[in-house]
Amino acid sequence: MARKRLTDLLREGQDPAEAEAEAEPSPAPASRTGRSPLTALKASLAEAERRVADLQGQLQERDAAHRAEVERLHTELEKVQKEALQLALANTALIEEVNGLRQSPPAKEPNAKFQPPQKQPLLPTYKVVPRPIQRAGEPRNNNDIPSWLL
């Protein structure tokens, strides 16, 4: 009893009902039509081959769809890369132009730019108010003579 067989060890981990089911191999099921086990095996083999062919067809269809998607994405990537290159070249040209304009003094063109008028200091303006002509010693009216001085 010290030595157990491998099948005994395997059966210990299983239910007793399952162990009995495995111990008794069942004969190949005969179909109801009275076919022999050989014809049943041939039929199941044909069914399996048909199923394999269907799955291979589905695999080929999916592979073709994936390849088409990869090709579309590849062309889109190339297009985006070309556009990015064009934008980078245009950006470089604009940067060079801006740097060139910063380094060179602006050329003065007459009538090209608006020149604001120069500021001049504001001088006070005097307005001359006309006065009636009067002789020096004569009062104009009696009302003009100050009465408080008399």
Swiss-Prot record:
GO cellular component terms given for this protein: carboxysome
S-S bonds: none
Keywords, sorted A to Z: Bacterial microcompartment, Carbon dioxide fixation, Carboxysome
Signal sequence interval, chain numbering: none
Coiled coil: none
Superkingdom of origin: Bacteria
Role according to the record: McdA and McdB together mediate carboxysome (Cb) spacing, size, ultrastructure and probably inheritance in the cell, together they prevent Cb aggregation in the cell. McdA is an ATPase that forms dynamic gradients on the nucleoid in response to adapter protein McdB, which associates with carboxysomes. The interplay between McdA gradients on the nucleoid and McdB-bound carboxysomes result in the equal spacing of Cbs along the cell length. Stimulates the ATPase activity of McdA, causing McdA to be released from DNA.
Assembly information from the UniProt record: Homohexamerizes, interacts with McdA:DNA, interacts with shell components of the carboxysome.
Name of this chain's protein: Maintenance of carboxysome distribution protein B
Protein species of origin: Gloeobacter kilaueensis (strain ATCC BAA-2537 / CCAP 1431/1 / ULC 316 / JS1)
